[in-house]
A protein has these predicted regions:
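Alpha-helical membrane segments and immediately flanking helix-loop junctions
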Residues: 1-2, 98-158
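Membrane-embedded alpha-helical segments and adjacent helix-loop junctions characteristic
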Residues: 35-112
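Transmembrane alpha-helix boundary/anchor motif
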Residues: 22, 70-74, 79, 83, ...
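Juxtamembrane and boundary regions of transmembrane helices in multi-pass small-molecule transporters
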Residues: 2-42, 70, 156-204
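Small-side-chain structural scaffolding
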Residues: 3, 17, 21, 54, ...
Length: 204
């Protein structure tokens, strides 16, 4: 709805996840990192499980997930009170400018990175329909948000599930910025006609 063709964004989102996972796995194997056995807190019972027990387990699991998400949301509110969002904005704004994303799209991109693609994407749709952001900046911003979004919430959730901070935050950030930097330079070689034909649809 914001303009970029869904197939292209889908390729970047799914393909980016697969490629980053592959690269991270190879780096960890090469460095013999994170090779220790994972310690599971919960061990499922072996054997047939009745429908009633399965239903109870699902309710417990969903309740725990809901409690974790509520805790993360509460923590995000606390961090916002202490100005973490403003700090992240000061960090990301010069990075986005150096990537080649125009100033009209930087604030919206930062919102998507911090709060999630649903918030940032919604703002991009509104600004795109109003014609306030150039099409190429919209495209670059959404690709970046597809690769790196909900930086606080997703990171906290993955840490609770046992993820490694370097892989789920810093490595992901480096991969996303590198991908968008390369994309900006390649797309700038494409004519406006080709860009709108293959990457961006024009609103009627």
């Amino acid at each position: 709805k914001a303009g970029p063709r869904w197939l292209v964004i889908g390729i970047f989102r799914i393909g980016g996840a697969v490629i980053y996972g592959f690269i991270l796995n190879k780096i960890l194997q090469w460095g013999n990192l994170l090779t220790e056995n994972n310690i599971l807190i919960w061990h499922p019972e072996i054997g047939p499980v009745s429908l009633v027990i399965w239903g109870k387990d699902q309710i417990v699991g969903l309740t725990m997930m809901f409690a974790i998400l509520m805790g993360i949301m509460l923590l995000m509110k606390v961090l916002e009170k202490f100005g973490l969002n403003r700090l992240l904005q000061r960090i990301f704004k010069p990075l986005l400018t150096k990537l080649g994303i125009g100033k009209e799209a930087t604030n919206i991109t930062i919102i998507g990175i911090i709060l999630g693609i649903s918030y940032g994407g919604g703002l991009v749709i509104r600004e795109s329909r109003a014609g306030r952001i150039p099409p190429r900046d919209i495209f670059f911003a959404l690709v970046l948000m597809s690769l790196f979004h909900s930086v606080i919430e997703d990171t906290l959730l993955m840490l609770l599930l046992g993820g490694n901070l370097w892989g789920i935050l810093f490595g992901r950030l480096i991969f996303a910025l590198s991908t968008v930097w390369l994309l900006v330079h390649l797309i700038n070689l494409v004519s406006e006609k080709q860009f709108r034909k293959y990457f961006f649809k024009t609103f009627l």
